[in-house]
Curated annotation (Swiss-Prot):
Key words of the record: Cell membrane, Developmental protein, Differentiation, Lipid-binding, Membrane, Oogenesis, Receptor, Steroid-binding, Transmembrane, Transmembrane helix
Spans traversing the lipid bilayer: 81-101, 106-126, 140-160, 166-186, 240-260, 279-299, 319-339
Extracellular side of membrane: 102-105, 161-165, 261-278, 340-350
Name the record gives this protein: Membrane progestin receptor alpha
One Gene Ontology term from the biological process aspect of the record: oogenesis
One GO location term (cellular component): plasma membrane
InterPro entries, per the entry: AdipoR/HlyIII-related
Chief localisation class: membrane
């Protein structure tokens, strides 16, 4: 009897296995989203950051998936991505209150919002996708620098148009916007060149930081002059507080950008959170938001001041804006081609 039962079970088990097959191991294992610094080329290394790097030469889908993974660029991506979404919301509010089509004095306001959204979006994209390969690392950060140049000119235009005092306008009206366009392009070129030559010493910092410092000094001069010339307390000028905030936030952002703080104090402890570049992003976002509030208040409240100043333009600011965008994109493209040749040559000599 027992033998007959065993024989029946032996015939039944194969059929059960066919109905309920055993789970097979996945042909495509879950990808590894982060690796140690030793597993990526030195080009991708960050000072004092030893883990949290993403592997190279994965699919584009892989890098887009890392938007929702922990790695050492995640905070950099999200700070500027969320800020870009906030700017879209702010633009929607502006569209409901500002006549961008009918009011000729509203165009600089639209340009500064567009420029801010551009630099935030390109920055988020660069930090998200730069780990694809050496070539794309260079190319996306070149594009990031284009966004910075666009934002620099947009800021200069908004300050010159809405925030400037008549006394300072009389001194700089013929040179301000052409110089702002040139310095924005020079800042983009210097940053791209510094990235290309990969010299961390004095030469590299000079190429990147000196043009940017000169551009900021010119761009913020209408605001600085107004702050210094205004009586204290300026209760009748609510935009002035936002202008002061944007200056403070920018200086803090510049300090964290240059000093690699606090990761230099806690090496190996700031892989995901607490990097100086992340704090640079946060303070730059705060600077941009404070700036937009100040410019919006100036657009509404200072019309009797700025309308007479801009009845006749010595320069076409829309043309200068497009020139800044076009020249910066061209510079980034040309340097990306130099990078391609350099990488191809390195592969041939290996």
């Amino acid at each position: 009897m027992a033998t007959m039962v065993a024989q029946k079970l032996s015939h039944l088990l194969p059929s059960l296995r066919q109905v309920h097959p055993e789970p097979q191991p996945s042909v495509h294992p879950e990808p590894v989203f982060t690796v140690d610094r030793a597993e990526v080329p030195p080009l991708f290394w960050k000072p004092y950051i030893y883990v949290g790097y993403r592997p190279l030469h994965q699919t584009w889908r892989f890098y887009f998936r890392t938007l929702f993974q922990q790695h050492n660029e995640a905070v950099n991506v999200w700070t500027h991505l969320l800020a870009a979404l906030v700017l879209l919301l702010r633009l929607a509010i502006f569209v409901g209150t500002v006549d961008f089509w009918g009011d000729p004095h509203a165009l600089p306001l639209f340009i500064i919002v567009l420029a801010s959204f551009t630099y935030l979006s390109l920055s988020a994209l660069a930090h998200l996708l730069q780990a694809k390969s050496e070539f794309w690392h260079y190319s996306f950060f070149f594009l990031d620098y284009v966004g910075v140049a666009v934002y620099q000119f947009g800021s200069a235009l908004a300050h010159f148009y809405y925030a400037i005092e008549p006394a300072w306008h009389a001194q700089v009206q013929t040179i301000f916007l052409p110089m702002a366009a040139f310095l924005a392009w020079l800042s983009c070129t210097g940053s791209c060149y510094n990235k290309y030559i990969q010299k961390p010493g004095l030469l590299g910092r000079t190429c990147q930081e000196v043009p940017s410092a000169l551009a900021y000094a010119l761009d913020i001069s209408p605001v600085a002059h107004r702050i210094l010339a205004s009586p204290e307390p300026a209760t009748d000028d609510p935009a002035l507080l936002y202008h002061k905030c944007q200056v403070v936030f920018f200086l803090l952002a510049a300090a964290f950008f240059s000093a690699f703080m606090p990761e230099r104090w806690f090496p190996g402890s700031c892989h995901i959170f607490g990097q100086g570049h992340q704090l640079f992003h946060v303070f730059l976002v705060l600077c941009t938001l404070a700036q937009l509030e100040a410019v919006a208040l100036d657009y509404e409240a200072r019309r009797p001041i700025y309308e007479p100043l801009h009845t006749r333009w010595p320069h076409n600011f829309s043309g200068l804006f497009l020139l800044t965008v076009g020249s910066s994109i061209l510079t980034a493209f040309l340097l990306s081609q130099l990078v391609r040749r350099k990488l191809d040559l390195d592969r041939k000599t290996q």
